[in-house]
Amino acid sequence: MTRHHQPRKGSVAFSPRKRVARETPRVSTWPELDEAGLLAFAGYKVGMTHVTALDSRKGSPTENMELSVPVTILEAPPLVVLGIRAYTKTTYGLKTLTDVIANDNLDDELSRKISVPKFDDIEAKIEELRNKIDDIDEIRVLIHTKPKLTSVPKKKPEVLEFGLGGKSVEDKLEYAISILGKEITPQDVFQEGEYTDAIATTKGKGVQGPVKRFGVRIQYGKAARSGIERHVGSIGPWTPNRTMWTVAMQGQMGYHKRTEYNKKLLKIGDESEVDLINPDGGFVKYGFVKNNYILVKGSLPGPSKRLVVLRKGVRNASKQVTAPEISYISTTSKQGV
């Protein structure tokens, strides 16, 4: 039998492991869909609970049986489309061509985040945008959140850029014009049973040693008797006489942007159904859900109160959308769990 060799568990694909510069996640990849519409939505992480749902997976040993499924709850108040952004392709990538910012129906707290123009002729700017359609290669929308409607103790909204679906640039532009200055709910973007990608900033854990950070083995034998166990036994060879950047060492752990693929949406509820999920005393370190909410199967990155972006899946072409049958949602108190 061969000797098991496992010098490390941490992947160098995530280097450098440093704190993210911006807690609000930035989406760099968008799926290409023919149907006009938003490709993402954002919500605040509330906490976790469990539901009892029917297993609809064909060929599963538990097919058509009820299972206890862990779920994460996101509070998803309406998002406001504050602007349209047009891009043109250059040799250096996409470059912003022009922006059109709405001047009505925007949150009063938006001025805490950006400088909002007050007297813009929107119709003239939209017509100018239509005249530049030959120079436009990509259309996206700017949206802002409404955290003051939730139990998150903040008023300043986040501003994000979301991609659009559509067969052509003209279709994307007309759809963006139709929703400019309007509120968007999660029901307008997703449907129950759909697979999405969750993008968020993970929990920060500060500076940690190589054992916790990379999963290296704790020293044993003579090395352990020296009194120092939680360190790397060798950080490199005699030649080349330098330390490689791939060597597991202590450093920042957590507070990184991460993407988790194919997270299934089990339920999308509105504000009239919050009693179905709110436990006695509210959720730990969050409070009560007051708005639209989304139940996502499994766990999501980040602590409670952190913004999570749900993007339409980029790897789920073969997955069918079937609304799950939920018979029970646990509302037992989460205090002390």
Curated annotation (Swiss-Prot):
Keywords: Ribonucleoprotein, Ribosomal protein, RNA-binding, rRNA-binding. InterPro entries: L3_arc_euk (IPR045077), Ribosomal_L3_dom_3_arc_sf (IPR044892), Ribosomal_uL3 (IPR000597), Ribosomal_uL3_arc (IPR019928), Ribosomal_uL3_CS (IPR019926), Transl_B-barrel_sf (IPR009000). It holds the Pfam family Ribosomal_L3. One of its GO terms (molecular function) is structural constituent of ribosome. Residues 1-26 are annotated as: Disordered. One of its GO terms (cellular component) is cytosolic large ribosomal subunit. One of its GO terms (biological process) is translation. Part of the 50S ribosomal subunit. Forms a cluster with proteins L14 and L24e. NCBIfam families: L3_arch, PRK04231.1. Belongs to the universal ribosomal protein uL3 family. HAMAP family: Ribosomal_uL3_A. One of the primary rRNA binding proteins, it binds directly near the 3'-end of the 23S rRNA, where it nucleates assembly of the 50S subunit. This is Large ribosomal subunit protein uL3. The lineage of its organism: Archaea, Methanobacteriati, Methanobacteriota, Methanomada group, Methanobacteria. The gene is rpl3.
